[in-house]
Amino acid sequence: MKTYDFMNVNSFSPKERPIRLFGFEFGASHEESESKDNYNENNESIKDDNKEKRFKCHYCFRNFPTSQALGGHQNAHKRERQQTKRFNLHSNAAAFFHRQQNHIAASRLYEDRYSLEAVQINDARLGLCRMYNSSASFNRDRSSYYNRYIPWFIGDHQTRPTYVGGGSSSHGLFYESKKNVPDHVSLDLRL
């Protein structure tokens, strides 16, 4: 076991270590030639590693030379996905709003093979219409069962649908409005 003088730094430092500048070692006589050979071998292996090391995008499978380039490219993919997501959310919300507006304020009859939903609305009676469940079942003569409905106000009574149109090919459905509601309602706000 060696004893070290901890007050003297040279007692436990390596004896002579060559200085390495730009891949070349200086300061060792016979080790210098060996280190050059080792450096050349190490340098070639590093070049081979760099040739093999490619960074691949997981979305479009492009190869990039550095991880930084790949990161920037993947950020672009992230922005594209966020924009697509925002567009889909906005378009779905707009389609839902448009569909609801068509159900509430339809000016013509609407019929499709799964549901009969059309509403004729007077501005004064906007909140007094009933909207029936769209998953109603149908008989052979295309009349439907409306046992379930969605009231818009608590305490509302169910109204019966009125069929409009004479032909069997097109049946229109309007909702009856309540008879005791005045035609004109004031929209002035008063305290």
Curated annotation (Swiss-Prot):
Zn finger intervals (C2H2-type): 55-77
Induction and repression of expression: By cytokinin and gibberellin.
Species annotation: Arabidopsis thaliana
Annotated InterPro entries: GIS/GIS2/ZFP8, Znf_C2H2_sf, Znf_C2H2_type
Subcellular location, record wording: Nucleus
Organ and tissue specificity: Expressed in inflorescence meristems, floral meristems and stem epidermis.
Predominant localisation class: nucleus
Protein name per Swiss-Prot or TrEMBL: Zinc finger protein GIS2
Gene Ontology process terms (BP): cytokinin-activated signaling pathway; gibberellic acid mediated signaling pathway; regulation of DNA-templated transcription; response to cytokinin; response to gibberellin; trichome differentiation; trichome morphogenesis
Alphabetical keyword list: Cytokinin signaling pathway, Developmental protein, Differentiation, Gibberellin signaling pathway, Metal-binding, Nucleus, Transcription, Transcription regulation, Zinc, Zinc-finger
